[in-house]
């Protein structure tokens, strides 16, 4: 039997976890590279108190790729709602914090938890230490902190990380170089995706890598990040931060969003991401448009199995 094709996926937040739940059932070798810029909620508290990278996004990805009894996954994802010190904490975050203490660093903690949860694939933090995400707004102000940036309410000019000199894991560089397909997204453009690519050497290696680079565009705009952005605007922001055009293919949703769901999102200043196929093609992009969303409790999500199948099809080209 031949070696399974290798896929490297960059992201964070809910979008990445949703995609991985479908992709893990395909005959591919998955590595998820996950942001360590989160500073809100349980992750932010553990990051500040224990001086470890934020575990929340990593926890969600481990759960998505796990192959354990549903009750074990539920236990790992359980969030406490009582107790002064425990309220708001996820048990999985606490376990990752404890494992970091036991193993000596965050990367080895993630590696060991991957074994415990029988993870299909690999999960790598973008760096083995916390980073701080900053955004320079179009009004000139610099806002610091991943959770603070969307609250400022101005258009983002650029984002950057401190410390500037932070090393990616050698394993991450190897994964990028050996990948048959590199997937970027879905996820928050400025606070989940770019914090990965801005880690020194990671962006450079992605640009140089021979693998096809696929951007899975968000279905809806995000208040405080991508208000009024088109699909082309998302790609332009990625290119601007990387210093060149590096995306080969973009996956966009062609399905009309039901009016009642649109109205709900509009109440939160979010709307469907528009796309102009000719504009995207003029940027040198291969455009794949399909009905790639599902709805649950009036929340829009990428259809994990449909998107996974489309990505596997790209490996056959």
From Swiss-Prot:
InterPro entries: CofD (IPR002882), CofD-like_dom_sf (IPR038136), Gluconeogen_factor (IPR010119). Keywords: Cytoplasm. One of its GO terms (cellular component) is cytoplasm. The keyword Cytoplasm applies. It is found in: Cytoplasm. Disruption phenotype: Deletion leads to growth defects when cells are grown on minimal medium containing ribose, gluconate, citrate, fumarate or succinate, but does not affect growth and morphology on minimal medium containing glycolytic substrates such as glucose, sucrose or glycerol. Mutants exhibit media-dependent filamentous or L-shape-like aberrant morphologies. GO terms for molecular function: LPPG:FO 2-phospho-L-lactate transferase activity. One of its GO terms (biological process) is regulation of cell shape. The keyword Cytoplasm applies. When bacteria are grown on a gluconeogenic carbon source, overproduction can restore a normal rod-shaped morphology in a mreB mutant by rescuing the PBP1 localization. Belongs to the gluconeogenesis factor family. Required for morphogenesis under gluconeogenic growth conditions. Required, in gluconeogenic growth conditions, for the correct localization of PBP1 and hence for displaying a normal rod shape. This is Gluconeogenesis factor. It comes from Bacillus subtilis (strain 168).
């Amino acid at each position: 039997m031949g070696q399974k094709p290798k896929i490297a996926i960059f992201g964070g937040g809910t979008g990445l976890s949703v995609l991985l739940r479908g992709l893990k059932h395909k005959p591919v070798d998955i590595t998820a590279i996950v942001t360590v810029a989160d500073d809100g909620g349980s992750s932010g508290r553990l990051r500040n108190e224990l001086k470890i990278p934020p575990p929340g996004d990593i926890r969600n990805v481990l759960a998505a790729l796990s192959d354990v009894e549903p009750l074990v996954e539920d236990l790992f994802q359980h969030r406490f709602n009582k107790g002064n010190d425990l309220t708001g904490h996820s048990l999985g975050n606490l376990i990752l914090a404890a494992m970091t203490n036991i193993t000596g660093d965050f990367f080895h903690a993630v590696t060991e938890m991957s074994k415990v949860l029988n993870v299909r694939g690999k999960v790598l933090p973008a760096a083995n230490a916390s980073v701080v995400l900053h955004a320079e707004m179009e009004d000139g102000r610099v806002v610091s902190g991943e959770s603070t940036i969307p609250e400022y309410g101005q258009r983002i000019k650029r984002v950057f990380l401190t410390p500037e000199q932070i090393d990616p894991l050698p394993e991450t560089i190897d994964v990028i170089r050996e990948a048959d397909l590199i997937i970027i997204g879905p996820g928050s453009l400025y606070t989940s995706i770019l914090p990965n690519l801005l880690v020194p050497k990671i962006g450079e290696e992605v640009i140089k890598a021979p693998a096809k680079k696929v951007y899975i565009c968000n279905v809806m705009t995000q208040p405080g990040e991508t208000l009024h952005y088109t699909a082309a605007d998302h790609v332009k922001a990625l290119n601007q931060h990387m210093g060149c055009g590096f995306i080969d293919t973009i996956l966009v949703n062609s399905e009309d969003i039901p009016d009642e769901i649109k109205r709900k999102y509009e109440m939160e200043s979010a709307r469907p991401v528009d796309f102009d196929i000719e504009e995207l093609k003029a940027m040198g992009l291969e455009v794949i448009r399909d009905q790639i969303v599902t709805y649950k409790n009036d929340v829009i999500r990428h259809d994990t199995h449909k998107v996974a199948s489309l990505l596997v099809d790209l490996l056959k080209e």
